[in-house]
Amino acid sequence: MQGTKIRLLTGGLLMIAAASYVQADTLQPDPAWQQGTLANGFQWQVLATPQRPSDRIEIRLSVNTGSLTENSQQSGFSHFIPRLALTQSGSLQAVQVRSLWQQGIDPKRPLPPAVVSYDYTMFNLSLPNNRNDLLKESLTWLGDTAGKVAITPDTVNYALSNSDMVATWPADTKDSWWRYRLKGSTLLGHDPAEPVKQPVDIEQIKSFYQKWYTPDAMTLIVVGNVDSRSVIEQIGKAFGDLKGKRDVPAPVPTLSPLRPEPVSIMTDAVRQDRLALMWDTPWQPIRESAALLRYWRADLAREALFWHVQQTLSKNNAKDIGIGFDCRVLFQRAQCAINVESPSDKLNANLSVVAKELAKVRKNGLSKEEFDALVAQKSLELQKLFATYARTDTDVLISQRIRSLQNQVVDIAPEQYQKLRQDFLNSLTVEMINQDLRQQLSQDMALVLLQPKGEPEFNMKDLQATWNEIMTPDAAPAAQPAVDDLHQDASDIPRTQ
């Protein structure tokens, strides 16, 4: 669920001190999104996009259950239920369902038909435009999946004999870095990729399905050039008769704070050494204008830092070094990293180069010229907001919506975004940005080195000593970071360079 250019109508943060000058107005949801709740608690959201008549119609059914709801006897249930559902036709004919799935996956940007994570299960359909018959069949099939999956010895055996089409988030739950990040968290014992134990206990699967697949824990999202009134009526027919109600809420997944000690991790995910200078803070929702402005400010400071370091390396003709920034929200933790890619034999020297530049920015801040150029660039982007929005594909729009829902961020209308953003840019000063930069660069950062498997393990003590010598020569206590200074994929900073 990462990445687009207008990431979108939730982009950055202003400092705590400035918050007192901002009236904490509640952000108003974008009225273009129609939403409602059926009598049984089932929620739906529809965005009609007449400006994108040729785009595919994107449909997502999110169920608030995942591997975290399993006990030890139920391990693998959350993954197996969508696998079971994908082998069934429900109230449709088998030939209809085959045709639906043949056309229900975008050939250019294919998504797995179902994804299971720790706290959600998502069913994904992407339909050709102007195919109301497929849209109706999709809603019917999803309605059957939401409450009418047949769980019998025959259907279970049939599902087990077919290939598993269900993906997980993250895609590789066994990844070395991911397992390290989960240390100290309840998520560690609840792998969404865990296969169901055999022989399968039919009654236990039924009980799990009835307990967690309840309409009051489901949200359907539809984005595309559709007749909203007709779609909403079809949603009522497909999902209105679902039964069940949650007795207990699903557990909320949380990560422990990032461990401060340096670590080297062997992984197949990189081809050369990648050192992440990483920090994280508790994530706070964005429901009021003051929180949005606080976010924008810290986000802009990070972007300024990225471009400053990149340009400095370019001016100095730095060789064998790549720089990138990555910010995201992971289960109630807001996490950022400055990534340094380097050959192993030059890693310590390259860390020294980057650390010296970070220390210089922390001490001196940005120049007025750099600040003015950044604000001018952001103002120019803002002028193109509506054109950018009009070019945003439906699959991007629905992905942004899902991220906003997961991170409790209010999606606001482009008009409100433009006004708030312009006021923010007009009120910003170089002193504000530099104060935020000093704050961010005074935090404790963990050194996390990803190394290709088979490479000799790097001595992390050497890297930590280099870092400490430059960044903490007096071992001064680290400043406390702002609690809500970043939001997943709401940054304009490129992920890698």
Locate the predicted segments by residue.
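Gram-negative bacterial Sec-dependent N-terminal signal peptides
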Residues: M1-Q23
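Proteolytic maturation boundary segments
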Residues: L8, S20-L47, D227-D268, D273-P282, ...
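Extracytoplasmic
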Residues: Q28-W33, A39-F42, R52-S62, S72-F77, ...
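Second-shell loop/turn segments in exported
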Residues: V46, N64-N71, I81-S89, T121-N132, ...
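M16/MPP (pitrilysin/insulinase) zinc-metallopeptidase core fold and M16-derived inactive scaffolds
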Residues: E58-S126, D172, L187-D191, E303-Q332
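Acidic/histidine-enriched segments that form metal/cofactor-coordinating
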Residues: R98-F208, L277, S352-K356, K363-I398
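Non-catalytic, conformational "gating/processing" segments within enzyme and secreted inhibitor domains
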Residues: I202-K237, D444-A446
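Structured mid-domain segments that build the active-site/substrate or prosthetic-cofactor binding neighborhood
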Residues: A291-K368
